[in-house]
């Protein structure tokens, strides 16, 4: 028997004549290849992909067409603005019989790359950065936003000042009545008592989103991540030895920051590099059972 299989999406009309903004699939898993410095392996990505269904008389789209386009893309292409634009355009063209004119795609993955230790030569470890791409295609134009989560350490300026005051008091109590203090005696005292009080610090996360220029040929994921880490000054480390941990302690002391400071530092580092950028930071407070948060954006509302 070679009876044709029914396709009700083509042969039936929707009972409710309502146009739909987006129709498609969510959470499709594919391997994706990247052209990023220090990234040598494909990433495991989750993809949402959709087209519009503006014609209310069309019952449904053809999801298998979208899946096959994505599957071929993952098999043969390297992720870039150009290849993403071509994929989205092909998604629209595959649904001309549904009168679709727009397509969008969201792609999420963890970007793994090696990061060197601060001091120890030859020592490095893997660090993961959650990344998301939001791309839309309409009227022959690609709109692409890239976001990434960057983890760093934040030390509270107020807590640092309070700790210094306590240390000052302890030092004065010990040496205040002496007209002369032997430097070696002070050094010994500091070695034993400098942690008389310590400021609170915590792991923190900056989520940044930027608009990729239309003429861009690369995603520039590592360029974005490096810029944020450099602005903050205290990115979390991977493999460390004592010398690296000491260097990290110095960086934390040199980069005291409130959540407001962190948001401003990152936004300032991004301005001028991208057409639009937004920053959202969270400090997972060790002093409080709640988080501190700040946001800023120059995206047009």
UniProtKB/Swiss-Prot annotation:
EC number: 3.5.4.16
GO function term, MF aspect, one: GTP cyclohydrolase I activity
Pfam family, one: GCHY-1
GO process annotations (BP): tetrahydrofolate biosynthetic process
Highest rank taxon of the organism: Bacteria
The UniProt record lists the keyword RNA-binding: no
Keywords, sorted A to Z: Hydrolase
Transmembrane segments: none
Reaction(s) this enzyme catalyzes, per UniProt: GTP + H2O = 7,8-dihydroneopterin 3'-triphosphate + formate + H(+)
The protein's annotated pathway: Cofactor biosynthesis; 7,8-dihydroneopterin triphosphate biosynthesis; 7,8-dihydroneopterin triphosphate from GTP: step 1/1
May be catalytically important (site feature) positions: 156
Function comment: Converts GTP to 7,8-dihydroneopterin triphosphate.
Family: Belongs to the GTP cyclohydrolase IV family.
PANTHER family linked: GTP CYCLOHYDROLASE MPTA (PTHR36445:SF1)
Name of this chain's protein: GTP cyclohydrolase FolE2
Organism from which the protein derives: Pseudomonas savastanoi pv. phaseolicola (strain 1448A / Race 6)
Gene name linked to the record: folE2
């Amino acid at each position: 028997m070679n009876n044709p299989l029914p396709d009700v999406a083509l042969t039936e009309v929707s009972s409710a004549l309502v146009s739909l903004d987006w129709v498609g699939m969510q959470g499709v898993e594919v391997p994706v290849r990247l052209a990023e410095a220090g990234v040598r392996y494909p990433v495991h990505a989750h993809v949402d992909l959709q087209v519009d269904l503006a014609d209310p008389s069309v019952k449904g789209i053809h999801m298998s067409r979208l899946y096959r386009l994505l599957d071929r893309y993952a098999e043969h292409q390297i992720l870039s603005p150009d290849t993403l634009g071509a994929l989205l355009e092909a998604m629209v063209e595959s649904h001309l019989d549904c009168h679709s004119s727009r397509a969008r795609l969201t792609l999420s993955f963890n970007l793994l790359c090696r990061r060197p230790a601060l001091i120890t030569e030859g020592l490095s470890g893997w660090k993961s950065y959650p990344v998301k791409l939001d791309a839309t295609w309409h009227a022959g134009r690609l709109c692409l936003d890239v976001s990434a989560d960057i983890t760093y350490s934040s030390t509270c300026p107020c807590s640092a000042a309070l700790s210094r005051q306590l240390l000052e008091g302890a030092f004065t109590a010990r040496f205040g009545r002496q007209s002369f203090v032997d430097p070696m005696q002070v050094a010994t005292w500091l070695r034993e008592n400098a942690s008389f009080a310590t400021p609170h610090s915590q792991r923190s996360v900056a989520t940044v989103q930027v608009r990729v220029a239309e003429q861009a040929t690369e995603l520039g994921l590592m360029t974005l991540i490096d810029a944020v880490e450099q602005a903050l000054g205290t990115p979390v480390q991977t493999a460390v030895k004592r010398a690296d941990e000491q260097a990290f302690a110095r960086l934390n002391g040199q980069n005291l920051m409130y959540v407001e400071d962190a948001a401003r530092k990152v936004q300032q580092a991004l301005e001028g590099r991208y057409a639009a950028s937004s920053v959202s930071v969270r400090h997972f407070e060790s002093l409080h059972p709640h988080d501190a948060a700040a946001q800023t954006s120059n995206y047009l509302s």
